[in-house]
Each structure stands twice: as structure tokens, then as C-alpha cells.
Amino acid sequence: MGAAFFYAGAMDVFTKTVSRPDQAGAEAAGLRWLAQALAAVVVDVTEVTSSSLSTRRVEQARPSAPAARAFGAALRTVHEAGAPAFGAPPAGWEGANFIGRVEQPCEPCESWGEFYAEQRVLPFVDGLPQGVQGIVRQACEAIKAADWDVKPARIHGDLWAGNVLFTADSAVMIDPAAHGGHPWTDLAMLELFGTPFYEEILRGYGAPKEYEKWVPMHQLHPLAVHAMTHGPAYYAPLEQAARSTLEALR
């Protein structure tokens, strides 16, 4: 989201600028929506303008197993606060939705499979090589055709390690792309780019054994975004995740 800097004389506040007016508003709305579920694990918004977002500085600490377990339990509490629908934006927010600097759809949908395929994966694959596109589209069709026994969760939506700031006794989330989604999507993104004490987060969360089977499917979204924005280095991982998804759905 654009350049970041501290305001002079306000070292307890972190302020970053944004390139589009809706970016700051979307992030602030997402943070406040997540905080309604459990404020202790969400960075506190102090000010939002059309060009910037200010949040209270987090007292960070070295990651630890107990903090990771506590964060996992807290993340489950946030998820269980729920959302009106899959693809539902943060409460009261009517503007655009972003993952990082990239705009993405966020329209309420009754079906998780339909939402995930059409709004979180397919929008990012049009410019990719035909072979990659083909297998990803096959996976998306299979996802849409499957029955999913899951209720809309209140998810962060961009929960990689850089958006988790460990504290002495837990962790705090920043920079969300919050929406109504599948709770395992947050967990799978934590795994994708490597998060300290990831297994302890899962333990604290209480992730079921079958979760691991579906990790590649839940990583299709961030991999598709990175394939679009970062190029060929992500083509093979995206293709493999799509193949693993098809295998899991057989």
C-alpha cells in the first residue's frame, strides 16, 4: 500500500500513504470489523484519510510457541464472529476491496465455491500462460461444483507472516483484505510464505486433521495474485496447487 513512514513527534503512531483513495478506507474498515470480534489481536486504527492510514504502534516481541498458540486461539475467535455471506465486505464498507495494492471483487455470495473461484482466483489468471490458466480453470470448475459444509467466517484475507506482528503473549494482525470467507484460507496463507511457530498456531486454533488436505486449494488465491504481479516464479507453484486441488476433489 504505498510508502510508509512515522509522523515526526508521534512515534507511537505508524502512518502510511496510499495510492488510491479507497485503499485506506478499505483497510480501516477491515481492521475495525475484525476488531469487533477481538480487539486484542488487531492493530488499533487512530486516523484514516483519503490518502493515509494511521495505526497505533505495536510493541513487538520475539515469536514464541506460547504466543503462537494464543494467537491461533484468538484467530479462531475472530473467524467464529462470522460474516453475512461469502464475499461480504467489512460492515459498513461500500468501496473497493484490495489485497495489497491489487483491487479484487467482493460481492456477497451464498456459495463458498462460487465465491472463491469467481472472485478470488479467476480474476487473476487471464494473463498467465495457457497451460497454467487451463489447469487453474479446471480446478475452479471443480471447486464450484463441490458441496462445502462451511459457514462464512470473518477472515483477514491476506494473512501472511508479514501481517502478523508477534507480541509478548500473542500476535496482532495488520493490513487485512477482510471479507466473509472460509476460515482455512487464513491458515493456508500463514503456511504458504512461512510463519514462525506455524504448527503452534494450528494447535492453538484447533485445526482438524483434514485441513492439511485442502491447503493447496486455499493457496490458489495468493498464488494467483503473485503469479499476476510477480510473474513466472509463481507459475509452477500455482499449477501444482491446482493439480493438488483436483486430486483432493476426486
Predicted regions and their residues:
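Short helix/strand-capping connector loops at secondary-structure junctions
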Residues: 217-226
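Active-site Asp-x-Gly
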Residues: 105-117, 150-154, 161-216, 232
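Alpha-helical elements of Rossmann-like donor-binding domains used by nucleotide-donor carbohydrate transfer enzymes
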Residues: 26-33, 70-77, 138, 200, ...
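ATP-binding pocket architecture of kinase catalytic cores
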Residues: 4, 11-114
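Short, low-complexity, intrinsically disordered N-terminal peptides in bacterial proteins
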Residues: 1-12, 247-250
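An alpha-helical support segment within catalytic cores of ATP-dependent transferases
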Residues: 83-154
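ATP/Mg2+ or Mg2+-diphosphate-binding catalytic cores
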Residues: 20, 226-250
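Short strand-connecting beta-turns/loops that link adjacent beta-strands
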Residues: 50, 168-170, 220
